[in-house]
Regions:
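Active-site beta-alpha turn of Rossmann-fold NAD(P)-dependent dehydrogenases/reductases
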Residues: 10, 75, 117-120, 171-173, ...
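Conserved glycine-rich Rossmann-like NAD(P)H-binding loop of the short-chain dehydrogenase/reductase
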Residues: 27-40
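Short-chain dehydrogenase/reductase
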Residues: 51, 88-96, 134-135, 142-154, ...
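Conserved Rossmann-fold NAD(P)-dependent oxidoreductase catalytic core, especially the SDR/UDP-sugar
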Residues: 70-75, 83-148
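Mid/C-terminal beta-alpha module of Rossmann-like enzyme folds, strongest
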Residues: 223-312, 316, 324-326, 330, ...
Length: 358
């Protein structure tokens, strides 16, 4: 029997990288990574550099992929101002065109196409606008304003109606994983902030707001969910929330992070990382040389500290976002991960990869 072939779109991102790592260990799968830039991690898969915003580039670069059976789409366009860009109409338009360019090309090229997994998140419930009904369920009504999740879902479901393949939408919470140059990588933000604090000989102080309960999703869990939805008929044309299965409070995780880096844990001190951290770019360069780390600049690892401020709740009132996992569990996917242990595991992995100092 011929192998299945998975096309990972957004292959250098947190979800893409974890999906490639997971499927590389499975028998019967060939992989293709799709990204604007060359791979920045070790893998032996086929890799295609393509501008997803260009329909012509997608047609030309993807025309040889005539045997793709599955697609995991996790690519996203973000503006420099990040959170404020989420409510702008051109942000939605660009993200829709990227998806459309890939799917239209692959639908034309590959007669073997079976399934497409599309990544979303809590913006589907208006999480970027403020509090929403909790726990959020897949059947909840939409929120107001431009939202590329809605545009992508509407287009994909309409386009698929006359096709033989099907789709599944996964909605994780805050995604944790290992990747460079991702504007939404909170692990890199935690690790570089801790490393710089240690180098300055100051305690590790939580820089965000008051205590609040949060949820997270490990990118490794998402990769396993991508595998599950891809071969279970019950998941055809369905939307699923997917989280680790527990909750966390940043203030409880911080002492464990301090212990991992061998430093003192200090009392919380609210501060804007957007304002303070870029000033440490030269110091980070000295840290990379001192500990013989891979040559990533601070802006490579954390392109946007605005996301860290947002997720740590700096200058915000507590705004918990909780989603129900009941649907995906009832349908047969019951995997889970301990969030506090996950944070430490991923930081250790970045240390082992010589991205962060030990």
């Amino acid at each position: 029997m011929a192998n299945k072939k998975l096309l990972v779109v957004g292959a250098r991102g947190i979800v893409g990288r974890s999906t490639i790592k997971h499927f590389s260990k499975l028998k019967g799968w060939d992989l293709v990574g799709l990204s604007r830039s060359a791979s920045d991690f070790d893998s032996e898969i086929e890799w295609i550099n393509v501008d997803l915003q260009s329909s012509a580039d997608c047609r030309n670069k993807l025309k040889s992929l005539n045997d793709v059976s599955h697609i995991c789409y996790s690519a996203v366009f973000e503006k420099e101002n990040l959170t404020s860009g989420w409510a702008q109409s051109d942000h939605a338009e660009i993200n829709l065109s990227m998806l459309r360019n890939v799917i239209e090309s692959m639908d034309k090229n590959s007669s073997k196409l079976e399934h497409i997994t599309l990544m979303q998140g809590t913006k589907a419930y208006g999480g970027h606008l403020g509090p929403f009904k909790m726990p959020a369920r897949e059947t909840d009504s939409r929120s107001m304003g431009p939202n590329f999740y809605y545009d992508q879902m509407d287009w994909l479901s309409e386009f698929q109606k006359t096709k033989q393949w099907n789709w599944t939408i996964l909605r994780p919470q805050l995604v944790f994983g290992v990747a460079a140059r991702s504007p939404l990588n909170i692990i890199a933000a935690i690790g570089t902030y801790a490393s710089i604090s240690r180098e300055l000989d100051i305690p590790l102080r939580f820089p965000g707001g008051v205590e609040r309960i949060g949820e997270a999703t490990d990118a490794r869990l998402i990769a396993r969910a991508v595998e599950w939805v891809g071969h279970n008929k019950i998941a055809a044309n369905q939307i699923y929330n997917v989280t680790n299965g527990d909750v966390y409070i940043w203030h409880h995780i911080w002492p464990r992070v301090a212990e991992l880096f061998g430093m003192e844990h200090g009392v919380p001190q609210p501060m804007s990382l957007v304002r303070l951290m870029p000033e440490n770019a030269l110091l980070w360069g000295r840290i990379t040389k001192k500990y013989s780390l891979k040559n990533f600049s601070l802006s490579d690892l954390v392109p946007s500290w605005r996301f860290a401020d947002y997720m740590f709740g700096y200058g915000q009132r507590p705004n918990p976002h909780h989603m129900s996992n009941i649907k995906i569990r009832k349908h047969g996917f019951s995997d889970c991960i301990d969030t506090e242990e996950m944070v430490l595991e991923l930081l250790r992995e970045m240390q082992e990869l010589r991205i962060l100092p030990r």
